[in-house]
A protein has these predicted regions:
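Positively charged n-region of N-terminal signal peptides that target proteins for export
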Residues: 1-7
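Generic secretory/membrane-interface signal
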Residues: 7-8, 17, 41
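C-terminal segment of classical bacterial N-terminal signal peptides
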Residues: 14-24
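Sequence context of c-type cytochrome heme-c attachment sites
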Residues: 24-130, 146-157
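Domain-level detector of nuclease and nuclease-like folds
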Residues: 135, 139-144
Length: 157
């Protein structure tokens, strides 16, 4: 009898702490904000990115081709040509998350909310990029003639 009472009393308490733990862990994850949020502190880099980086307006190409693509093909486009597609808080649709519709700053540098919350600390954002980072989308099979150095070192921002 005692054991049943203890189990009945402990179950709601245990569930409460589990919910709090899950919510706290989820809140600790950085979320996507969109490139305009980056521009507030990184205006010069943002302006260069918008002017020189082809991916800064990648949603236009997807919208033009969308009617000729299957849902699967469209999702494949989203994985590289939008920000955070398929990840928590990432791009969902042009209507629901328009601020993430292009391949923006956070595609390379990661979700920016913690970076902003911590006052711009470099420990909460990817500041040094490597060719491996680019290869997530720019693999040989996807882009035969991709030249990493001009984008990585040549003023994409």
């Amino acid at each position: 009898m005692r054991m049943r009472f203890f189990a009945a009393a402990a179950c709601p308490v245990f569930l409460f702490f589990m919910v709090v733990a899950v919510k706290t862990a989820h809140a600790a994850e950085a979320t996507y904000m969109g490139s305009k949020a980056c521009a507030e502190c990184h205006e010069e880099q943002y302006d260069k990115f918008k002017k020189y980086a082809k991916k800064a307006n990648s949603s236009h190409s997807i919208k033009v081709m969308a009617s000729d693509l299957t849902e699967g093909e469209l999702k494949e486009c989203f994985s590289c040509h939008t920000t955070g597609y398929g990840r928590p808080g990432g791009f969902k649709s042009f209507e629901e998350t328009p601020e993430l519709a292009d391949a923006g700053c956070e595609v390379c540098h990661g979700p920016g909310s913690k970076h902003v919350d911590e006052g711009g600390g470099v420990q909460s954002i990817k500041s040094r990029l490597s060719i491996k980072d680019c290869e997530a989308c720019h693999s040989e099979e996807r882009v035969d003639a991709f030249n990493f150095k001009p984008m990585l070192f040549g003023g994409a921002h």
